[in-house]
A protein has these predicted regions:
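Structural and coupling elements of P-loop NTPases
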Residues: 1-685
Length: 685
């Protein structure tokens, strides 16, 4: 592949709602620049970007895909991202590797849930953005309505730099508000014409908006604009670039992926107006002294691994954004996170599933490296003599948890390793072994996320697995008191067994576990046997009498007993303690406890009533509500874990996909009587 320096590179993430046409836009751009010989389609399985079995089956993007192409002497790296909330981790990772984003919006649907989410992610990174209004050929397409909706929602910095020629079935091209000419597609050829007379009013209105927006962020242009002086094409372009780079102006373009209209103009605009990585400085930590340091493109080599794919044949495939310096094949680099040296045997530029060898790559480029041994997503590669460590991306919380197990006996030994490799590829998945319940759990962003993970286990690693509802770690305790004797006596000639204890049971403090005390006087139970009594108490209380769950928050006092000089032993007193528990706990009003979790739910304020109502139906209680901004509310609530099964799905439904939450263990509380009866009956079957 041709060698490109930093000024000749453009990196853009294609983001937006599902089915807005992100993949189709990338496919059109690849075709227009000659990287492919046809426009692939996700719907018929011919896309070069959506090629994984799970994507072909569902006809949707699941994994972000790198699409590199050459255009007018520049290299454009597109990262096509998913548009469904379960895979937002892919979107965040892609944005960290790019200097700008193309937000794709449907001309028929306007702003949707993932449009808003992707915009906010890019805004958090202060990334320049352009908007591409797709599907201009569709029935009910309305460019001007969508532009107004965007301006009302995201601000007046959003401004068209082109407007459509025609709409719906008559859509045939775009009018460029900067060059003041039109680009029309006729018989698959892009032709350039002057603005037709019938469009001049629309063009004048739109150009006035563009001039006004550019002037607002450029003092020199503002002065000329207010004085009515003519503003040249060069001045408009310069002001536009300044506004875009500073994330003040967000240009709007349009087209149709179905008709192949607008993509030469899109790529020309990317080269002309979107930022180059050359001027971007990257901040990191010097691992030698933990001080903050800056790296510019001309400095020593450093790069950030933003994505990993585990290939069943090749192994680990790492996607690297080079932030400074130059990377050459057959060289060695240092991983400042694992503190290991890695060998770069080869570099590749990617066009979806196709790869092209690349001998050298410069700062700003995005490349693929295979067979790294000690490098995972989020790691920094650098020059060992001048080390740096970049902060890894923060992924969305894993809100949906299920238990997982091998569906076949033959896969039981393989599932652990397969899951580890899957997490290498997708950091938004988390695996946890609950030693108490015995469940192996897998957590993800949503239900679809875990369904896809199960399919990947089979397709990539040949492991058949199934999901099921994880068990809940209930507890048992007492609400009353009792005093009982536990006597173990076996004396039938010869050396016998004798242990006799009196135990008092009473409720303990919340969170205190099992508290054992002794108030023996007069040697009723010899000192050497008291540890055996305590051991018997603690071991027996691990299995409660109601449903077999561990007993907690209970005080046990050994206050009396008796012994035999010959027949008493540690085992006899341990057994006596167990007998006392089995007799005394039923008399002390035993109850079942369930775990409560604290939820912090972030939602648009509009949905607060529905979400609070939903919490109430789940036996939850609201602890606090706050509104950190005019359109965002945070609800803090405590809810029993038993009611949170599939809450991620419930919240998504209640908020149209706009809500998220985190949860952490809070405490245990008594289970209501009717529910307790059901749990006890189920466990005693």
């Amino acid at each position: 592949m041709t060698e490109f320096n930093s000024t000749q590179l453009r990196n853009l993430a294609l983001v937006g709602h599902g089915k807005s046409g992100k993949t189709s836009i990338a496919e059109n751009c690849l075709f227009k620049c000659g990287a492919t010989n046809r426009v692939g389609k996700t719907d018929d399985g011919t896309s070069i970007l959506d090629y994984e079995p799970e994507e072909v089956k569902r006809k949707m993007t699941i994994d972000s895909s790198l699409a590199s192409c050459e255009w007018q002497g520049y290299k454009i790296n597109f990262i096509d991202t998913p548009g469904y909330p379960d895979f937002t981790g892919e979107v965040k990772s892609a944005l960290t590797a790019c200097e700008s984003a193309i937000v794709v919006v449907s001309a028929t649907s306007g702003i949707e849930v993932e449009t808003d989410r992707a915009w906010k992610y890019a805004e958090e990174l202060s990334l320049p953005r352009a908007i591409f209004i797709n599907k201009m050929d569709r029935e009910h397409a309305d460019f001007y309505k969508v532009v107004e909706e965007l301006r009302a929602h995201f601000g007046k910095g959003i401004v068209p730099i082109q407007i459509p020629i025609g709409s719906e079935a008559s859509f045939q091209g775009v009018a460029d508000l900067i060059t003041m000419n039109t680009k029309v597609l006729i018989k698959n050829k892009d032709l350039i014409y002057e603005i037709p007379e019938y469009m001049k009013d629309d063009v004048d209105t739109a150009r006035h908006m563009l001039m006004e927006t550019c002037a607002e962020f450029n003092d020199e242009l503002l002065e000329k604009y207010l004085e009515g002086e003519e503003i040249t094409e060069t001045e408009v372009a310069a002001a536009l670039i300044e506004g875009i780079v500073n994330a003040k102006i967000f240009p709007v373009l349009c087209g149709s992926a179905t008709k192949g209209i607008g993509f030469r103009q899109l790529m020309n605009s990317i080269i002309e107006y979107m930022p180059t990585p050359y001027f971007r400085a990257s901040m990191g930590i010097n691992p030698k002294n933990n001080e903050l340091i800056e790296r510019r493109t001309e400095d020593a080599f450093s790069g950030y691994v933003f994505k990993t794919v585990v290939d069943q044949f090749i192994g680990r495939v790492s996607y690297l954004k080079i932030l400074s310096g130059t990377l050459i094949e057959n060289s060695s680099v240092y991983n400042s996170v694992s503190e290991k040296t890695e060998r770069i045997s080869s570099l590749y530029s990617a066009c979806g599933k196709n790869q092209q060898a690349q001998k050298i790559a410069h700062a700003g480029d995005i490349v693929i490296i295979t067979k790294l041994q000690a490098t995972k997503t989020g790691d920094t590669l650098c020059n060992e003599e001048e080390p740096i460590k970049y902060e890894p991306v923060t992924h969305p919380a894993s809100m949906f948890t299920m238990a997982i197990k091998a569906d076949k006996k033959a896969d039981e030994d393989k599932i652990g390793n397969a899951l580890t490799r899957l997490v290498d590829e997708d950091p938004t998945l988390t695996i946890y072994k609950n030693t108490e319940t015995g469940d192996l759990t897998i957590s993800g962003v949503g239900e679809l996320h875990l369904d896809v993970a199960i399919e990947k286990l089979l397709n990539k690693f040949g492991v058949t697995a199934k999901l099921y509802q994880p068990a809940i770690a209930y507890r048992e305790t007492i609400r009353g008191t009792s005093k009982v004797e536990g006597k173990h006596k076996k004396q039938s000639g010869g050396h016998g067994q004798y242990g006799d204890v009196w135990l008092e049971f009473s409720p303990g403090e919340l969170g205190s576990g099992v508290t054992f005390t002794e108030t023996i006087v007069g040697g009723a139970v010899p000192r050497q046997y008291i540890p055996a009594v305590e051991k018997g108490v603690r071991e027996t209380l691990q299995t409660g009498i109601l449903a077999g769950y561990p007993m907690v928050d209970i005080k046990v006092n050994l206050f009396d007993g008796s012994y035999h000089t010959v027949d008493s032993s540690e085992m006899a007193f341990k057994t006596a303690a167990a007998l006392a528990i089995k007799k005394g706990i039923p008399e002390a009003k035993p109850v079942l406890l369930e775990p409560y979790y604290t939820l912090k739910i972030t939602i648009p304020e509009y949905y607060m009533g529905d979400v609070i109502s939903g919490i109430n139906t789940k036996r939850g209680r609201i602890i606090n509500t706050e509104s950190p901004s005019h359109d965002v509310s945070i609800i803090e609530a405590q809810v029993p874990l038993a009611e949170l099964y599939k809450y991620a799905t419930d919240l998504r439904s209640a908020t149209q996909g706009r809500g998220s939450y985190t949860m952490e263990f809070s405490h245990y509380e008594e289970v209501p009587a009717k529910i307790s009866e059901q749990i006890i009956a189920e466990n005693n079957k």
